[in-house]
Amino acid sequence: MPIPQPYDWFHLVWIGIVIAISIFLVCKFKNASDSDVRKMAGIFWGVMVVFEIIKQFLFGIVVEEDRLVWDYMWYFFPFQFCSSPLYILPIVAFAKDGKFRDNAISFLATFSLFAGICVYVLPSDVFMQFTLINYQTMIHHGTQIFFGVYLAFRYREKLNFKNLLGATAIFSTLAVLALLMNVLTYHLFPALGVNDYMNMFFISPYYDCPLPLLSVVYKAVPYPVFLCVYIFGFMLCAGLIMLIMKGIIKLSEKNNGQITNNK
């Protein structure tokens, strides 16, 4: 297929699909049992993992002299912000009830939801010549959106500042791990003869941050300041998502109450 363009038929169809699935999940399973939510989290996680494995193989296989050669592109290693559901969904699916799981739910309903929305609004960088990759990215980021929206409705009582701080702790931990990977590979790859690099979470101290707005901050301030702005900025965005979702949920409950009273 030709490389999709922002807001062409391919993109618009997937926007419609994600909106439809979001509405379906909220209407059908808003009050589902915790056991059912765990099953859904496990299923969505499995789907995302399978497509991610396929994606990684496609990025690792190249054609040289009419034969397939494995030459993995470490830049695409699955530890970006949008890869976080691969590591957080199992917590929602399998962890015991408690603060840690509540924070994971809050993370998926705020941070991860925001990341998915960003890709769907500005998808230019994720579309490419591989048809399967284009479907994978729409499925992956679409799942971030519709399951994030669903979790916000299902666990609406957990949408609070306390759990947002817990979600921020998860995000910060992932960012620190990403930074360690960036630093270690920067020094290890040349010694190992690997002609590639990592910029996980786009916070490498050695390579520019390509994200909108943050790319300007990266070049304008010392790196430690950039890192603080990065984490605090995404926390603010996640908080905004939380407030928007709380408003939508409140409006939905109000409308449902009016419909019930009119019957």
Where are the model-predicted features located?
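Aromatic-anchored segments of alpha-helical transmembrane domains
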Residues: 47-57, 111-123, 171-182
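Membrane-interface transmembrane-helix boundary segments in multi-pass integral membrane proteins
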Residues: 1-16, 165-168, 189-239
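Membrane-interface helix-boundary motifs at transmembrane edges
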Residues: 28-41, 95-104, 154-165
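Non-cytosolic membrane-interface motifs at loop->transmembrane helix junctions
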Residues: 65-78, 128-139
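Membrane-proximal helix-loop-helix units in multi-pass membrane proteins
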Residues: 91-148, 152
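Juxtamembrane "helix-exit" motif on the non-cytosolic side of transmembrane helices
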Residues: 56-66, 120-129
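Membrane-embedded alpha-helical segments of multi-pass membrane proteins
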Residues: 12-20, 78-88, 108, 138-146
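Alpha-helical transmembrane segments in multipass membrane proteins, preferentially the mid-helix core
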Residues: 21-26, 88-91, 143-161, 175
